[in-house]
Structures are given as structure tokens and as C-alpha cells.
């Protein structure tokens, strides 16, 4: 069983668990900012919701404050009629709540308008516009991380907020996900100094692009480090977080000195994102949370015919449960449509309070838990940094194979953790099974460690045609053959076969490995079959390695075919057999295997919805009960107690022949089975 990670960050304490994030992104068209957020108005509505901490509006992407900033060069929205920051500070202090500021970092439109020389420049020397903006008249609005913006405006304004309002922390938005390579003179000079290359590459086809992209990443990380160090030096105890930094899309050693890790989840269809974030963030060694949007729309942000609507409470509970099971905190984002004067909406605050009670009920059973290692999915930082798919530091990352591996394994009810090389290398022997999903560019150190892991008794699943070159035919027990391009073959599973597409497919022949199944040109199981196996399993030392020579997990993430998930389960069964903990449950149940002290806890999260399958409807409402669930756990001695921690369900258990068998008839949203 794994040891608890030592935290390298800071937080306000265990009881600060559920938060409210409120922001407006104040702009030039506002007219009544701060008019309706007096302490008298705020306090009853905050009590109704009962958050443990609050993040309030400060400076959004337009670069305008919703308070009277006195920092030279600051841009105060012309719509400020009363100082909202002062009112929120008084209200939260009287309620005993920490107050953080929502502060947009790299993305600052007002600073770009005043100081074009501070902004990111494209390869042509022109403005780059907003994130993902490629057409129309592009303006300066994103700051260069090497430019004077940080020292001239951002840090002075943060220090002003600390000194004038005694704020307790900063949640810096518009940072990682707003950054892309900059071609200003500062960056060009630094690039040439670091590399000796005169001209930075203009596009992704240039052989130096990966190096240039990583130069940008390192420049950004240095910028965040500078503001963290400056704030901590000015007033120790003020907490700092950069939105999405050190999360699933930014793997590697979390050495940047932020105090906690956070990111705001997608407003709709965000459940899958949280499934990965929770399993990765719990390996970072820092306090972490995910911010859930309390509202959504069905057809994209900003479309008039798809206005924002409040999420059902149960939708937020379901999204939260995925995070809570892995020991994370949760905050919710509120921005009532049409209200710019600072008002909170009573019926909405009541709803978020209901969600908060659901969350706080789970603190005792979730907080401070650690994983029971079962399946580790490798999310190599070396692979990601060698394969950027775009200019953006967050969105230009190829995470698809890792997502596909996690989702397919969860549907087979394995306990899954996501670890980068930094986290996995020192803990490799803890995990009975490791899956390396098309991580073609993992480090040589990782390859050798995985080979040694197998020789020592571990079980490894690798996928992708390039894995043959990385691990070698002798280790995999196969001989490499033709490399097919844009190929679809059918692989047998269950009572049939599933089509699997791969950009490249290596047709291998077993040598020492045992081939399983045959590739088919059609769904037929007894005709038009190739001699090449669907997958292979090789014994190496005391362990085993399974090899699927195609982009299996990329395909699953794109198509989510149940038969393909069944094929993944077949491969895992041949490779790993029966593990110490096995769960049988409906496919919509996610499992989290955790421990607290000597207690073992099996978390069950219901991802199902009672709403019909409609592509235009992202809501989760009327969540149906699901079951039955059966858990089998190898235990030499009978437990003293087996009980449900959260919901009142029909539970029974027995212990015989060294196996504990637990049966739960049904559960609703989130249940935790506690074994003592």
C-alpha cells in the first residue's frame, strides 16, 4: 500500500474544503460594478451557500479592475461605482473566510492596448490576438512572459491587493492556456543566447520546433516562479495558484513554487476531464482542487440561441464525487447571467449550498486518503514535451492515448492512477500492473525501468507500433514485420470482433511471446484472417509484457466502442489475471481504491444519467440508482467491520478461504465501502 505524499505546497487547513469562485471579467461597457455587493447583501447569501473559502473578481481578461486600483498604469473599469473588493473583504472577514483574488495573468487586453511592446508577437512580428483566434483584426492582448508586464503592472497590483485589502491568495487565470511562442526581440535574443540558433522556427514543421516550444514552456514557468517568489517574500502565508499549471496537461516534477494546484473544468461534458485530473493531481504532492462551473450551455460559449443555464445540483454532485474520491477539494464557479452589479442569486446560492453539503459530508472519508496501487497509467512528460500538437502550452498537447487508456480501464472497473515519469519511477514496484499507452517518446530511463520492472515480476501493457522500436523485439517476444498505414483490422473480443483503426499498424509475428487471436479483414471470426495476432503476451523474467502493435487507446478515446473496451479487458485479463481487489459493477461505475490509516475504502462513483442520449443536451439530471456491485478482495483474515460510509444501501459480506466478498444491491451517486 502506498505511502502518503509529502506536500510541497500550502493551504488554509483541512476544514477549508469547499469554495465559491465568483468573477465578472470587468470591461469597458460595465456601468454598475460593485453596486449590489455590500456586506449586508453578501453575508446572508454566503451563509446560505456556506463555502469555506471565496475567490472574487479582481481583474479579468479585459485587464480592467472592478475595484479602485492605485497602481501606476492600472486600468479601472469605467463601470466601477463602489469598490467591490473592499466589500467582499469586509464580508468574508466578518464570516471568517479566506479571500482569494481572480486575477488574469498573461491575458490582459488593457495592458496590450497601452503597451504593445509588452505583448506576445507572432512569427510575422504582428499581434497574435486572443487564444485560438486566427482571423480578423488581431490586437495585442496577451503578455510576453519575458516582458516587463510582470514587474511593471502585475506584481505591483498584487502587492497593492495584499497591502490594501489583506487578501489571502491569488488564483491566476489566463496564464498557461493563454501562452504560445513569442517572437519579440526579447524572446529572440534569449533563444539565440540559449541555443546558438539565430532564427526561431516559425511553424511546427521546422526541425527545431520542439525545442522552441519547450523554450516557451520554460519561459512561462520562470515567469510563474518569479511572481510566486515575490508574493511569498512580500507576505509569507499569501497563497498563489496558476490556473491549470501542474495539472494533467502540464506533467513533470511540480517544482514551480505555487501553493496549490487548480483548474476550472469544462462547462459541459466535463466529467471525463475530472476523471483524469483526479487520478493525476493526487500524485502531485500538493493540495489541489478542481473548479466546477455551476452553469452550462449546449452549443458552445457565447451563442445567443444557447444561453447559460444553472446546472442541476445532482450534476455538480456527480462531477464533485469523481474528485472527492481522490482526496481533492472542490470549488464552484458562479457568474449569474445579466447581473454585473455584484448580486448573488438566492435560489442559486441555495442550490450551491445543497452541493456543498454533499461535498462536506464526504470530507472525513475522502480527505487525506492515499491510493491502493493497482494499475498505473504512464503519462510521460518526456513524450508530451517531444510531441506538441499546436502552439498553445496547454491545448497543444497529445493526451488522447492516456485518456483512452484510463477510460477503458475504468469501464473494466480497475483502480487506476495516472503517473508521469517523475512520480512513477520511484514507485514503480508498488503497482501490480503498468500501462504505457502509445508513449512513444518516453525517456530511455523509463524504458529501462519498465523492462527491469517486468523482469522483477511486474506486468506491463504497451501499445503502439513504435513500442517495438523502443522496447525491442526480444523483450516483447515478437518479430517486427510490415508497418501498415491508415489501417483498420478487426480484433476478436467477447462473442464477436471490433474494428480498430490505427494510423500505423505493425504486423508482428510471435517468437517467444504467445499470440492471442488473429487480425481480421472483416468481422468474420473464421475467414479472411491474417496470421498476425491481435496482441501478444511474453514472459520476461518473473513478469509479463503484453503488446498491442497499434494505437489501441487513441482509437478507444475517439470512438468509445463497447467492443473495443471489451478487447482492452481481454488483454488485461490475459496479462494480469485476478488482482487482489476485483470489482464487478455496471459499466457506468468508476472505482477508486483508497486507504486511510488501516482502513481500506472502495469508492464507487455513478456516472450514469436518466436523460436520454441526446447530443444537444449536456445536462445530467435524475441520476438513476445502479447495481448490483460485487467486490472480491484477498484477505488472509476476516475484517472486523465492513460498512457503507455515505448512502444507505443493502450491503452484505462474507469471508471464506482468504477472500472477502462484498455485495451491494444498489447505490445512487457516490458510495464508499469501508473495510476495517
Regions found by a protein language model. Give the residues of each.
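Active-site mouth loops of central-metabolism enzymes
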Residues: 24-37, 139-153, 303-313
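Aromatic-lined carbohydrate-binding/catalytic grooves of carbohydrate-active enzymes
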Residues: 47-83, 107-126, 179-187, 249-260, ...
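Short, solvent-exposed turn/loop segments enriched in Gly/Ser/Thr/Pro and often Arg
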Residues: 23-25, 55-64, 103-110, 171-182, ...
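N-terminal structural segment of carbohydrate-active enzymes
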Residues: 2-64, 95-97
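Aromatic- and glycine-enriched glycan-recognition loops and surfaces
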Residues: 30-49, 70-95, 152, 222, ...
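Glycine-rich, aromatic-flanked loop segments that form ligand/cofactor-binding clefts
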Residues: 17-19, 50-58, 83-134, 171, ...
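Carbohydrate-binding surfaces of carbohydrate-active enzymes
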Residues: 2-15, 45, 99-100, 164, ...
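Active-site-adjacent "subsite" loops/lids of carbohydrate-active enzymes
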Residues: 101, 105-165, 200-213, 225
Amino acid at each position: 500500500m502506498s505511502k502518503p505524499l509529502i506536500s510541497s505546497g500550502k493551504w488554509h487547513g483541512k476544514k477549508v474544503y469547499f469554495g465559491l469562485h465568483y468573477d465578472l471579467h470587468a470591461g469597458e461597457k460595465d456601468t454598475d460594478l460593485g453596486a449590489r455587493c455590500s456586506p449586508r447583501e453578501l453575508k446572508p447569501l454566503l451563509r446560505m451557500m456556506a463555502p469555506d473559502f471565496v475567490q472574487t473578481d479582481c481583474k479579468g481578461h479585459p485587464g480592467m479592475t472592478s475595484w479602485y486600483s492605485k497602481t501606476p498604469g492600472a486600468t479601472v473599469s469605467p463601470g466601477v461605482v463602489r469598490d467591490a473588493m473592499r466589500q467582499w473583504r469586509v464580508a468574508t472577514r466578518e464570516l471568517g473566510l479566506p479571500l482569494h483574488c481572480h486575477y488574469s495573468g498573461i491575458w490582459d487586453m488593457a495592458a496590450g492596448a497601452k503597451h504593445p511592446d509588452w505583448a506576445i508577437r507572432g512569427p510575422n512580428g504582428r499581434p497574435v490576438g486572443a487564444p485560438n483566434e486566427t482571423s480578423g483584426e488581431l490586437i495585442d492582448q496577451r503578455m510576453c512572459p519575458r516582458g516587463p508586464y510582470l514587474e511593471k503592472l502585475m506584481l505591483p497590483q498584487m502587492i497593492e491587493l495584499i497591502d490594501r485589502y489583506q487578501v489571502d491568495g491569488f488564483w491566476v487565470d489566463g496564464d498557461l492556456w493563454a501562452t504560445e511562442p513569442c517572437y519579440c526581440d526579447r524572446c529572440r535574443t534569449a533563444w539565440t543566447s540559449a541555443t546558438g540558433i539565430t532564427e526561431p522556427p516559425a511553424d511546427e514543421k521546422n526541425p527545431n520546433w520542439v525545442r522552441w516550444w519547450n523554450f516557451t514552456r520554460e519561459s512561462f514557468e520562470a515567469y510563474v516562479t518569479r511572481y510566486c517568489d515575490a508574493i511569498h517574500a512580500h507576505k509569507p502565508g499569501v497563497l498563489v495558484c496558476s490556473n491549470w499549471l501542474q495539472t494533467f496537461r502540464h506533467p513533470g516534477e511540480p517544482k514551480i513554487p505555487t501553493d496549490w494546484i487548480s483548474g476550472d473544468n469544462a462547462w459541459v461534458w466535463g466529467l471525463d476531464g475530472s476523471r483524469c485530473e483526479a487520478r493525476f493531481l493526487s500524485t502531485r504532492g500538493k493540495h489541489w482542487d478542481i473548479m466546477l462551473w455551476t452553469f452550462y450551455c449546449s452549443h458552445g460559449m457565447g451563442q445567443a440561441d444557447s444561453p447559460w443555464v444553472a446546472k442541476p445540483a445532482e450534476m455538480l454532485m456527480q462531477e464533485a464525487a469523481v474528485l472527492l474520491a481522490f482526496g481533492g477539494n472542490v470549488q464552484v464557479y458562479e457568474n449569474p447571467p445579466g447581473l454585473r452589479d455584484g448580486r448573488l442569486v438566492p435560489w442559486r446560492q441555495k442550490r450551491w449550498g445543497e452541493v456543498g453539503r454533499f461535498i462536506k459530508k464526504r470530507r472525513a472519508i475522502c480527505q487525506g486518503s492515499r491510493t491502493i496501487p493497482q494499475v498505473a497509467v504512464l503519462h510521460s512528460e518526456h513524450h508530451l514535451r517531444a510531441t506538441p500538437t499546436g502552439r498553445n502550452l496547454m491545448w497543444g498537447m497529445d493526451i488522447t492515448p492516456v485518456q483512452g487508456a484510463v477510460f477503458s480501464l475504468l469501464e473494466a472497473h480497475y483502480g487506476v492512477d495516472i503517473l508521469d515519469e517523475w512520480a512513477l519511477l520511484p514507485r514503480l514496484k508498488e503497482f501490480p500492473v503498468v500501462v504505457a499507452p502509445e508513449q512513444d517518446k518516453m525517456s530511455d530511463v523509463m524504458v529501462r525501468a519498465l523492462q527491469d520492472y517486468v523482469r522483477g515480476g511486474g506486468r506491463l501493457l504497451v501499445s503502439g507500433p513504435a513500442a517495438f522500436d523502443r522496447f525491442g523485439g526480444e523483450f516483447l517476444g515478437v518479430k517486427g514485420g510490415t508497418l501498415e498505414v491508415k489501417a483498420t483490422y478487426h480484433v476478436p473480443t467477447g462473442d464477436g470482433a471490433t474494428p480498430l483503426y490505427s494510423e500505423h499498424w505493425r504486423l508482428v509475428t510471435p517468437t517467444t511471446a504467445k499470440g492471442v487471436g488473429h487480425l481480421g479483414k472483416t468481422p468474420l471470426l473464421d475467414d479472411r484472417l491474417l496470421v498476425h495476432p491481435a496482441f501478444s503476451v511474453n514472459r520476461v523474467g518473473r513478469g509479463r509484457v503484453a503488446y498491442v502493435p497499434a494505437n489501441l487507446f487513441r482509437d478507444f478515446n475517439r470512438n468509445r466502442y463497447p467492443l473495443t473496451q471489451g478487447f482492452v479487458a481481454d488483454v488485461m485479463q490475459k496479462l494480469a489475471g485476478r488482482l487482489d481487489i476485483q470489482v464487478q459493477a455496471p459499466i457506468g461505475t468508476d472505482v477508486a481504491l483508497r486507504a486511510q490509516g488501516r482502513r481500506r475504502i472502495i469508492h464507487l462513483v455513478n456516472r450514469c444519467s436518466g436523460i436520454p442520449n441526446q447530443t444537444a443536451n449536456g445536462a445530467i439530471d435524475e441520476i438513476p440508482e445502479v447495481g448490483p456491485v460485487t467486490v472480491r478482495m484477498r484477505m488472509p483474515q476476516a475484517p472486523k467491520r465492513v460498512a457503507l460510509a455515505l448512502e444507505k444501501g443493502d450491503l452484505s459480506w462474507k469471508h471464506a478461504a482468504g477472500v472477502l466478498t462484498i455485495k451491494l444491491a444498489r447505490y445512487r451517486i457516490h458510495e464508499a465501502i469501508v473495510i476495517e
